[in-house]
Amino acid sequence: MPMTLGYWDIRGLAHAIRLLLEYTDSSYVEKKYTLGDAPDYDRSQWLNEKFKLGLDFPNLPYLIDGAHKITQSNAILRYIARKHNLCGETEEEKIRVDILENQVMDNHMELVRLCYDPDFEKLKPKYLEELPEKLKLYSEFLGKRPWFAGDKITFVDFLAYDVLDMKRIFEPKCLDAFLNLKDFISRFEGLKKISAYMKSSQFLRGLLFGKSATWNSK
């Protein structure tokens, strides 16, 4: 019985989950919900099902795997990762995983808040001014390691790839000064399962956000 991943028909918080499902060769189907157009942005496709799925905290994304019903994007990632030993092995690796998991979400939400803000054009210059210093921290944290936790890939590499890719979509030259981050991106995209998925019709790189965002990618 395949797992069911439920989310809006955008990239959003499901991107890293989709990538991890593909990398682990997991059997899954997607339930994609469509947001209505402006000005109402009708959410009835989701709201009609929201409280009928048996979710403890009904929200998107969700993952249903038999009796296991999970919400919160990072809880979903961790659930999949535990099945495949992708949470780090040593204590040092697990600490690095925990740190980066939360750091990535902080940086992800900064960009989300900016892109949904009606004052986007006013706020964008300050965001871009501060971006190099934030990327420098990622570069220093990665160092000469192939993956963020160490020698072996973990689920936070999927989160890190997602947020770094979002930033280079937003500002295409932002990674130019950080060779190890560019190498990380290339290494990740070169993974056999990831490369195949990115070439498929199922892959969704654009539409970072919902229709109500002030700025979005195509």
UniProtKB/Swiss-Prot annotation:
Binding site for glutathione: Y7, W8, W46, L47, N48, E49, K50, N59, L60, Q72, S73
Catalytic activity: RX + glutathione = an S-substituted glutathione + a halide anion + H(+)
InterPro entries: Glutathione-S-Trfase_C-like, Glutathione-S-Trfase_C_sf, Glutathione_S-Trfase, Glutathione_S-Trfase_N, GST_C, GST_mu, GST_superfamily, Thioredoxin-like_sf
This protein's record includes keyword Cytoplasm: yes
Superkingdom: Eukaryota
GO MF annotation, one: glutathione transferase activity
Subcellular location: Cytoplasm
GO cellular component, one term: cytosol
Residue intervals of the GST C-terminal domain: 90-207
Binding positions (substrate): Y116
Pfam families reported in the protein's UniProt record: GST_C, GST_N
EC nos: 2.5.1.18
UniProt keyword terms in alphabetical order: Cytoplasm, Transferase
Disulfide bonds: none
Boundaries of every GST N-terminal domain copy: 2-88
GO BP annotation list: glutathione metabolic process
Quaternary structure, from the entry: Homodimer.
Similarity section: Belongs to the GST superfamily. Mu family.
Functional description taken from the UniProt entry: Conjugation of reduced glutathione to a wide number of exogenous and endogenous hydrophobic electrophiles.
Official protein name in the record: Glutathione S-transferase Mu 5
Origin species: Homo sapiens
Gene responsible for this protein: GSTM5
